[in-house]
């Protein structure tokens, strides 16, 4: 009955071997699907800047065997892989798999960095643009944008702060559809205090990341309905998924 839909267990921030994840798309689908708990996941592999220093270091370490991001000439194949696995996930597990990407800006000047997820992405989006341009391009595709770990600041040399969207929220909040209020094991209480539309995600890269913050969405189990519920951000809750169980 409309209005009385159950909560769906969702994770909208998942990486695979298409970027810096440990598992293939098929292995991710089987990991989430085999729990019998998940209703919706989004595969959101990185689209990187050309001069991303972390990715360049990774390519050197792997002798060029991995790109650590989805390149423009591979993007159609990436979507085809996600589409094929989405069909299998729905048939085998009753689980929706949404195509996405994390448009990733890692600069040495950390105050300029942003990581932005596009959910239900249809076309490649370059990370070489400004955050404003990326957000507008996501909206132009009728996709959903998520500000990833928006209040993550670090003083570690090998980590990247990603606070540009948060530091410029007054100018950009109308373009950001959702803000991560929780990412893996971290809670960003400042996001909820501002009453911005929120989600919670695992930022999955390896199997142990399955046990982390997730989103509960009260919605019918189809992407148009889930997308509307996320935008409305009324029947939404955070949950901590632990040892195969969750609680709102």
Region locations from a protein language model:
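An N-terminally biased module of ancient metal coordination in phosphate/nucleic-acid-related enzymes
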Residues: 1-99, 103-104, 132-135, 208
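Charged catalytic cores and adjacent phosphate/nucleic-acid-binding surfaces used
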Residues: 1-19, 25-30, 34, 54, ...
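Conserved beta-strand positions in the central sheet of alpha/beta enzyme cores
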Residues: 41-44, 146-147, 180
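Flexible loop residues that form catalytic
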Residues: 46, 150, 184
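Generic beta-sheet signal
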Residues: 100, 148, 201-202
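Aromatic-lined carbohydrate-recognition surfaces of secreted/lumenal glycan-active proteins
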Residues: 144-156
